[in-house]
Amino acid sequence: MSNEIVDKLYKVILDRIEKRPTGSYTAEIVNKGKAYVARKVGEESVETIVASLAENKERFISEVADLIYHLLVLMALEGVTPDDIYRELERRRK
């Protein structure tokens, strides 16, 4: 697996933010504002921690996916791309 799925998801998120289609969860949370999206990131972080402590791998994977999705939405609202994060991670690796 590569970064491809993250990049594809980010592009879908950008499209949903731009077009705000009815029935889109992304559009729904973005319409509530950046503070709401940031709170969702916090909630998903806690849920990820709880799933980890419960030692339930399937639940943990699901919560990590939710956290990544909400982080990508917040990143889009901040104008930060996955490439920005990849570069920062690469910089830290050195």
Swiss-Prot record:
Keyword presence, Transmembrane: no
Keywords: Amino-acid biosynthesis, ATP-binding, Cytoplasm, Histidine biosynthesis, Hydrolase, Nucleotide-binding
This protein's pathway: Amino-acid biosynthesis; L-histidine biosynthesis; L-histidine from 5-phospho-alpha-D-ribose 1-diphosphate: step 2/9
Any one GO molecular-function label of the UniProt entry: ATP binding
CDD domains reported for this sequence: NTP-PPase_HisIE_like
Top-rank taxon, per record: Archaea
GO cellular component entries: cytoplasm
Record-listed E.C. numbers: 3.6.1.31
Catalytic reactions of this protein: 1-(5-phospho-beta-D-ribosyl)-ATP + H2O = 1-(5-phospho-beta-D-ribosyl)-5'-AMP + diphosphate + H(+)
Enzyme type, top EC level: hydrolase
Listed GO biological process terms: L-histidine biosynthetic process
Compartment(s) of residence: Cytoplasm
Family: Belongs to the PRA-PH family.
NCBIfam families assigned to the protein according to its UniProt record, in alphabetical order: histidine_hisI
Protein name stated in the entry: Phosphoribosyl-ATP pyrophosphatase
Gene this protein is translated from: hisE
